[in-house]
């Protein structure tokens, strides 16, 4: 996969983020390094390794699912969103 200006523009649009022009070259280099690293994983022979679902013997310990409301944190996060309304993020429609 080639990391070029077209890919960066697509990622900017999908993420609703904007990358400064002076940072784009560094970002392209970093993304290319990440992709090359991940592509190296395709060369690893795992045919003799048994599949596992957890690294913890006996399964993953569960915790009670409890909700917490922190209005100060919520407001802080929403203040940094490009668009928000009534405590929710407003995002562009992507599915017709």
Curated annotation (Swiss-Prot):
Subunit structure: Heterotrimer of A, B and C subunits.
Protein name: Aspartyl/glutamyl-tRNA(Asn/Gln) amidotransferase subunit C
Alphabetically ordered keywords of this record: ATP-binding, Ligase, Nucleotide-binding, Protein biosynthesis
Keyword Ligase belongs to the record: yes
Catalytic activity: L-glutamyl-tRNA(Gln) + L-glutamine + ATP + H2O = L-glutaminyl-tRNA(Gln) + L-glutamate + ADP + phosphate + H(+); L-aspartyl-tRNA(Asn) + L-glutamine + ATP + H2O = L-asparaginyl-tRNA(Asn) + L-glutamate + ADP + phosphate + 2 H(+)
GO biological process per UniProt: glutaminyl-tRNAGln biosynthesis via transamidation; regulation of translational fidelity; translation
Enzyme Commission number(s) of this protein: 6.3.5.-
InterPro entries in alphabetical order: Asp/Glu-ADT_sf_sub_c (IPR036113), GatC (IPR003837)
């Amino acid at each position: 996969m080639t990391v070029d200006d077209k890919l960066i523009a697509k990622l900017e649009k999908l993420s609703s983020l904007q990358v400064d022009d002076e940072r784009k070259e560094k970002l392209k280099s970093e993304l290319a390094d990440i992709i090359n690293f991940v592509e190296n994983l395709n060369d690893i022979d795992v045919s003799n390794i048994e599949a596992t679902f957890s690294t913890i013997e006996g399964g993953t310990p569960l915790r009670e699912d409890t909700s917490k409301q922190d209005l100060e944190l919520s407001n802080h996060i929403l203040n940094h969103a490009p668009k928000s309304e009534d405590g929710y993020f407003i995002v562009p429609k992507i599915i017709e």
